[in-house]
């Protein structure tokens, strides 16, 4: 359907659908529209009109003053000066004015109204303002004559480009505007002919094409005679004449020219070399003077070929910056044509340019391919030199500057880059385009005698050269010079001295630049005079050494003499002196037989001049080493004919070849064919014995014959031995022997029989087809672009037996083994069996190769899906999803379905798709695509369109839909993975949610989503089709993502009453401004959002009236105008449309429309109010909290707009309570500056019939719309329906008002809970708590339940309880309470008690439980905010974090928590089946995080999901270790026992997953490895139908308990990730650009919903890099407010790491600071051990052991063995405060200081070592040496003489924590020093830091703990960093695994003198308990710290770092059984520690 027909149909539809329009608004105009008075204000291109009274952005004189009767109101379309139709100036600065998008009224309308008489004020503007006066006769699709009378609406050029509007200057500035051509009909962008050229044309929207003729045809004769074109007299053009177009008719395209082409007026614009012409009016890229202004009669239009200055032929300047101008590729017309047209007389304006612009004046006699004499008369067009180089244009100075220009040689024919001889040298020549070769002779031959007598060369008198004499060439003829030679040229004695490439010969007697032995002394008879060409050693022809240092020698540019000449002169006898040079100087001896285009045999005898390879590359010269260095030179192969760059075969390979000029391709065979047999028998190839190759064997080429190119292969191609070397994507193959760019093992050494020669396609390891590694670093390998041979060929050759050397590469190198069955263009079923070669998506994108990770990293590779046919980039379905798909080459679109269709039924039954068992996907489920079929295209939808499965993808505004699987340009959660049944295929319109109609996200970044341009199916269709059941994944995206659910009523162009019910799609204001989207905050911030006004229809940017304004309005897109009323009219009020509304007519507000008020009068004074209180006129002035009201007329303390001016009927008297804007009750602003407003303390009057008022349904700022019932003193159900007025909590506290933020800030307001009845401070239950509650007025108690009781449950109450559906809260879940009802008292619990909801609140020792919402006496994080589904109500016993049973914090300050006094319920069948499903917190963001749960079988050898249901008998870990029995405590003590986990199947030692780990695991029987994952795989999807067991997914604990689930190793060091990084649990927190990550639980600077609560299983700890939503790699939000998120600077782990989970290894992470102290010093540098050996002045240091030049005796190595006095290195043996020094080598200066910088600290977090600790369970006594620097906070406390006596812990750069008893020997700080970063106790490493102690602080209550302040801060490195302090009063849970370290007594065990570690368990408080101390050890074994470790650390791992929980204090002996070690409890002293550090 044509565009115009669509427009007409749409207009008809709107006319029939819309109700009768107002008589004010006109949507059509009569005549020329002078009488039009409508309110339309949009132009034909959609631009908004500028107001007539405004001068911005366009100055004009069409104002009401100048045109008082023209109706110039606002920005409405008008016609003040009688042009063709109504128009306006636009708001777009780039477009001055346009006609309006209005149509003429029909005749019936036209006769009814006579346009008024309009007498405009005379125009005060220039005539450029005039517009055309003719009528619009309709649309014409052909034109008469030359089209000047054409007034159609066509706007497309002959090349399909869109026309630019005539009034627009973008992209082309011009003068064909309506102002200058008022009668030319220049409306919009329609094709016109304003200046009488050949046909209608227009300027184009393409910046690169100025104008083109339109794609219109001339009308037929019948049409042509019917209409006489009007007389058009255009206003004289005010533009430069350059705009003038040719005046002749358009007779067709002229492809030839007459004479010299001055009369040519065709449209050709291409030069002889194919370059595009530059426009004559353009100065880019070449500035010139041939412009239309200077040559007005030369027809210089656009970039057409012309001849303005009478040169030889039409020419033009080119678009190529390197070529100024060229002749055009036109031919002269034949004589018949030539006589028919006499060229016009052209008198050009004299040129204003330099004479260099002049072109030659001679005629173009045709192309000559030979020349006469020396070629001075040659005027052909040849432009290639003898070596194949392209000539430089004579007028160009690039790349060679010269003086042979047309200006200096005007008669030499220097046109373009044609070969010429301007200065009478030997033959035509030219400068070359090659910067390395200045000039060469051209590859032309002399004409024969017959030709020579026919043409007498002209007399050429060149202008004297202005160049340096070096440029001069000989001008005389050379009479005595021989220009040819006889035989091989040994007798040649001429004076020629130039080589074939134009180089000058070196003199034979000179050794510069080349040293040689061909001198006159050694060859006295060879005529070696000067630098003349000679042949002293009988090679093929005369040659010489060259003056070019890069080219040693070349043959001379001489030809052999003819036979006639040959008989006249007998060559002399030449006996050369034997050569003294190496044979490399030898040159070939054979004759030059001419040019051959085929070769015999293998081509060794070929002596032709062909120099192009099979791929079209140019050959490198054999004597050149650029770009490839080689040994096939004329010196080494003198008989091989290695002349210039001709194809040769010097070493007997398959065919002639050459090295190429392409640096990326070393060599290739030449594009030559073998000669036929007839030719082959005629010439016997000579015997060639080449000099042995001096190159490495890598240079060798294949030795087999070249039987022709094999372009197909047999079988799988193992026998293929062809020479093809290109992949299916066109990439060049990498040589098999090369390791660049890809290292591999498919080399000739390992596969000797596989034919791995050069880079030819091969199949060494029997994959599907020949392949190769590619030269592209981003693509490792691809199949080759070869096809299988036909059957006939296949039976003829048996592939050879190939036994490759076993592959040395990883299996990832393997390729699929299936055959290629041919090309399929349709697929069966879901396309799993498809094996075709299609590789294009539905949007036309090219597929990414499956084996490539660029641009998208993924796991669908041939390695993981070996049977899925993942060859090259062909469309496949490995998963399976709905249809074949692929990843795309477009970085912004990850994947799309392929543009394939399903095969027909006949085809479908013929092929059964194969059984495909893919390797389980290693990617996130977000990769999955929908599984439904494509049912065909539907162009209408049923109901709300949920069942629509058509293929439409255009929105109502014409935008293209974004693909559902794409996140560009809009990120979203409506993906096929989360809505698998919604049919989200490609970018088709769908309704997954469901909303009102099908919709989609758009590809326009500025418009997020729109409804699709679809209509609802007719009733007949509706009844015929039942939409399918659609089960939607619940949308968890932000509430503003939801669209309206009401039916689309169509387009409304009028509104009823105040427009509150208006749901149309109009979005323009009365001044023509575009509306801002309601959900957008740009450019205006506001609160009228869909979240706050969910029932107001705030969809997109449509006009609405959410708050009872007088009419629909919107915020505008103009930053300077906040809001305006919309350009809508009221609908005619009929009986059916009457609504009961208030009579509210306020004055228009200039601010947000919420400021409006009703107009009713005050009825008197009252103490209660009716309805919502809008009619209240009492004198009450106190709020619900007792605050006094602010006067309405006052702006203090709160500025506002509720004044009598804006609300004259609102009764705003004094400070009385009022309700001016339809709130839920009267209110006022308060006198309290901290509380803006509150509801008043008034009650509703008793509801009687007379008191019922009709109120508006809209609410301004907030509040629900339901009426308040009477007072209730009990509640039904959970109390959500309670609307009573009770406001006291269970403890008697008064409730806080819901609208108040004092004393507690919250979000339970009427905006977020409009249906929650949140009136005043009444008890309510807005969020489905277990009963009504409220915030309290007590600042110390945030909220409590109300003192209400449940109503008796009777039938009547059950039936009358209203249904209240609260709006979901958009606040953080911190406020949420459990939603389940209390089931009564439970005295037992099931499983681990996570489902327990009883009311017991007593521990096993009888202590009372602390309330979960309280922080007294124990601060904690088990609050409803973080555990919303854990039932954390009051102080009831619960198990929020998967402990072994319910527990609670206690009210006893000395006991942090205990298990509750509950027993486990008996395990019966019913109890197992009724175990509730505990689901995690549903994400309030996009549902992309949710994945479908897998089914679980009962017993199997694979596991489903995370393996919690696995009941198999596997008992081996991934590393082959045997599992420990679950009921055993040896070798690992644990709490995962059958008693504690009765439902987890903990039988024997079988692999299980009792606590929601990643997969089944077990404790191992290896004492050094606590646990590992089991060696199991996930079950395939086909097994997913087995019965599912109850799913218990607890929210993970945010606080460590004793048995943290073993879901990962302690994530201290992990700098790489596996797969896409979803499993990454390292601690890296820096992005690729170096930005720091934002904490996942923080909302600053970026608000988000990727929180630990919403993604409990994704490890969102602190600010560590993670991948919670299956992106391509770990990422994080950044701390940079301007950058929301970035990928992290992490790399993927190696393949070996990706296949198994290896035991923890020691990964040394490079320090981010200095690597050691070698390059810098700590403190005063006393410990400096670097190698600096010069002083600050640069003087060398004297060696410390030397006595010269300075004698010394104090500081020598023998007496200062600890000072490191090595060699002459700078040292500080005496602790000089100025730093290291040395004795100098200057005899006058004894010593000087060295310039050594201080070391800088690196940035490391506390408690996170950069080396993974060993965590060995042995004891220090038993000997477990720690990994060096894995406990970097360990301190060695020493005496000032260096003896170690105690340990300590670094807790900040300046502070060390140790035991107080370590400091009893001395109270002086100078007695002590500390050693940091040491691993050895005695032989200290060079990087250790030695720091003095400056102050001591003992704990004041005599606890065994003390603080040391260091004399300077320690430098934080990867070897020295602090441990973390615990939270104050934190209680370590019993059985927590902790670690002690130290160098203490080891009682003779292994590792003495090295830092040791040991693992201990914290002992229960009942066994060993004191509030100042904790106890820890293995009670049954000898593991303890000994005396030497006093003061050392006891650290426990929590979440992601090590916390210092204890300081080693004392114990009974050393590692005695049942005698635990005692440690000072650090958490008890944290307040004291922090105070000391802060105050000192």
From Swiss-Prot:
In the UniProt record, does the keyword Disulfide bond occur?
A: yes
Keyword Repeat in annotation? yes
Q: Which residues are glycosylated?
A: 61, 101, 215, 329, 443, 557, 671, 785, 899, 1013, 1127, 1241, 1347, 1381, 1461, 1575, 1689
- Which UniProt key words apply to this protein? Atherosclerosis, Autocatalytic cleavage, Disulfide bond, Glycoprotein, Hydrolase, Kringle, Lipid transport, Protease, Repeat, Serine protease, Signal, Transport
Name the InterPro entries on file. Answer: Kringle, Kringle-like, Kringle_CS, Kringle_sf, Peptidase_S1_PA, Peptidase_S1_PA_chymotrypsin, Peptidase_S1A, Serine_protease_kringle
Give the enzyme's EC designation: 3.4.21.-
Q: Which domain of life is it from?
A: Eukaryota
Q: Membrane-spanning residues where?
A: none
> Which SUPFAM superfamilies does this entry report, sorted A to Z?
Kringle-like, Trypsin-like serine proteases
Enzyme class, top EC level, equals hydrolase
Q: What Gene Ontology cellular-component terms does the record carry?
A: extracellular region; plasma lipoprotein particle
User: Domain Peptidase S1, which positions?
Assistant: 1820-2038
Ranges where the record places region Disordered? 1147-1166, 1365-1388, 1476-1497
- Which GO biological process categories is it annotated with? blood circulation; lipid metabolic process; lipid transport; proteolysis
Molecular function (GO) terms for this protein are: apolipoprotein binding; endopeptidase inhibitor activity; fibronectin binding; heparin binding; serine-type endopeptidase activity
According to the UniProt record, what happens if one changes residue 1685 to R? Answer: Loss of lysine-sepharose binding
Disulfide linkage? 28-105, 49-88, 77-100, 142-219, 163-202, 191-214, 256-333, 277-316, 305-328, 370-447, 391-430, 419-442, 484-561, 505-544, 533-556, 598-675, 619-658, 647-670, 712-789, 733-772, 761-784, 826-903, 847-886, 875-898, 940-1017, 961-1000, 989-1012, 1054-1131, 1075-1114, 1103-1126, 1168-1245, 1189-1228, 1217-1240, 1274-1351, 1295-1334, 1323-1346, 1388-1465, 1409-1448, 1437-1460, 1502-1579, 1523-1562, 1551-1574, 1616-1693, 1637-1676, 1665-1688, 1720-1799, 1741-1782, 1770-1794, 1846-1862, 1938-1996, 1968-1975, 1986-2014
Residue intervals of the Kringle domain: 27-105, 141-219, 255-333, 369-447, 483-561, 597-675, 711-789, 825-903, 939-1017, 1053-1131, 1167-1245, 1273-1351, 1387-1465, 1501-1579, 1615-1693, 1719-1799
The PTM entry states: N- and O-glycosylated. The N-glycans are complex biantennary structures present in either a mono- or disialylated state. The O-glycans are mostly (80%) represented by the monosialylated core type I structure, NeuNAcalpha2-3Galbeta1-3GalNAc, with smaller amounts of disialylated and non-sialylated O-glycans also detected.
Short name of any one Pfam family annotated for the protein: Trypsin
Its quaternary organisation is: Disulfide-linked to apo-B100. Binds to fibronectin and decorin.
Q: To which protein family does this belong?
A: Belongs to the peptidase S1 family. Plasminogen subfamily.
Q: What does the further note read?
A: Apo(a) is known to be proteolytically cleaved, leading to the formation of the so-called mini-Lp(a). Apo(a) fragments accumulate in atherosclerotic lesions, where they may promote thrombogenesis. O-glycosylation may limit the extent of proteolytic fragmentation. Homology with plasminogen kringles IV and V is thought to underlie the atherogenicity of the protein, because the fragments are competing with plasminogen for fibrin(ogen) binding.
Q: What does this protein do?
A: Apo(a) is the main constituent of lipoprotein(a) (Lp(a)). It has serine proteinase activity and is able of autoproteolysis. Inhibits tissue-type plasminogen activator 1. Lp(a) may be a ligand for megalin/Gp 330.
Protein name per its UniProtKB record: Apolipoprotein(a)
